[in-house]
Amino acid sequence: MKNQNKFDPVFPLSSEQLNNLKELERTCTNIQSAWLSGYFWKIANQTSNITSFQTNESEKNDPVITIISASQTGNAKLLSKRLYEYFNKNNKISRLIDAMDYKFKKIKDEKILILIISTQGEGEPPEEALSFYKFIMSKNAPNLNNLYYSVFGLGDTSYNLFCQAGKDFDKRFKELGGNSLLDRFDADIEYEDNYNKWSQDLLQSINSKEKIYKSSVSYIDQENTLILSKNHYTKKNPAEGIILTNQKITGRNSKKDVHHIEIDISNLNIKYSPGDALGVWYKNDSNLVKNILELLSINISETITIKNDVITIFDALQNHFELTNNTKNIIKSYANFSKNKFLKDIISNDSDLENYTINTPLIKMIHDHPLKLSSQQLIGLLRPLTPRLYSISSSQEEIDNEIHITVGVVKKLISGHVYLGGASGYLSQSLKSDDIIKIFIQTNDNFRLPINKNTPIIMISSGTGIAPFRAFMQQRDNDNADGKNWLFFGNPNFTEDFLYQVEWQKYIKKGLITNMNLAWSQDQKNKIYVQDRIRENSQEIWSWIEEGAQIYVCGNASKMAKDVEKALLDIISHNAHLNLEESQEFLNNLRLNKRYKRDVY
């Protein structure tokens, strides 16, 4: 009988392959080992994502235009796809790629690069562009003297660091010697007209400089090129779902108000995957609209024209304009209309204006300082209403013709009055069974379950960040996946805030969830958060990482996600004996190989 190698159960390799692997391991540093681990895991899990390019002889000397989409909520991706199609119609060879999949170390070989990028959090790049951002800002970034580029930034002027990610990339490209095709454009939430002009000017600039870069053609790297998906329903053309269930799932004594909402899509051709988000068009509360109009002495029946449609001012405020979030620009304009000394003093001091913006909803400002405005003056103050995105908390394989979302109601208690968020207030308070809701799917290919169903996963969440992991477990259960599953979840109280408790207990009983660690911050004197539970399980988490586990984080970007990342860096540093810089490189390698994925907001 042949003697069995003791490694056979673990390594499906020949003796020669195993010896070569052991020799390679002997010569590798910790960083190199981490990179190889991620590299081979990516090879095992990747599928073809190639767009076929066909060029005729006359096109072979044309420069390739690389369009990079760096999106947080889908707007940058949408505009990138439009630019790709626009270039194709104008006989330009282009490729479209997500920032997450871009091989940024090859940027030195690019001739023309267009970056369309949003900004999240405190002036940070979107999640899928973090690795690209860190590389281009590092000392390892190459000389870009041969690069022609343009940056289109997407943001919101109500935030201090407006379009900061785009500004950072633009500045760095210039520092590295890049040649700007067109001045960077920083677009506010109403970007349509600006984008149209920018894309036309960009094409003209590319054509005018064609002789300069046509002699040297950049290589079209087909691997990871983004395949354009066709979805019948979009932000501009939403579907109409039907509310099946709208149920509060936090306890009566909870400080949080969280709703589980189920939507019927049986008559719609909608497909989605775990990790995707649901876009929701909401309506402003009718009482809020009436109060604003009354305080400003505007008749609710007055009509205005919006995009060639004549509608009442009431309809306009309820369906087309943002009424819950105040902004610095609104406050400044309102102060100038009112001539109110208090407001004038507020806008003359940056710190006071910042605090007033945060703590004073639009309706409170109008209530405290009413004046008479015309309908057109009011509309000129306001920002357009935009849809809100919610992580989908269901798997279509499991529940078929439904979509579930988990909505945390935004509440502010100011001067004894509770102010609700526009979208969350609408979803939780206004919608009942059989009501119509306008929706669309926002795909998120950067937050997907592993293709290999044997891959272990670690899910880290707090609050409503648990939503996509409910979808993940439904999918894993439906697939009979053998991969281990570890859930970390944090919220204030066990009895009041354990979202979907019965379902998690069912999965534990079935053996689908291997480990579950819970953090209840207010159930004991010393507050315990999810990052504390992570540190408590340092050695086992490291063991899972060595086994090829993929790590998912969903929750608050400014606090929870940052604290979790610090905890993960501590685990890497301790178990791999790396310093902080090496640990950051290790974690970045996990991100690059799609083993560390975040959906934060």
Swiss-Prot record:
CDD domains: SiR. SUPFAM superfamilies: Ferredoxin reductase-like, C-terminal NADP-linked domain (SSF52343), Flavoproteins (SSF52218), Riboflavin synthase domain-like (SSF63380). Pfam families: FAD_binding_1 (PF00667), Flavodoxin_1 (PF00258), NAD_binding_1 (PF00175). Disulfide bonds: none annotated. FAD binds at T324, I358, R388, L389, Y390, S391, T406, V407, G408, G421, G422, A423, S424, Y601. The keyword Electron transport applies. Residues 236-450 form the FAD-binding FR-type domain. NADP(+) binds at S521, Q522, K527, I528, Y529, V530, Q531, D563. NCBIfam families: cysJ. This is Sulfite reductase [NADPH] flavoprotein alpha-component. It comes from Buchnera aphidicola subsp. Acyrthosiphon pisum (strain APS) (Acyrthosiphon pisum symbiotic bacterium). The gene is cysJ.
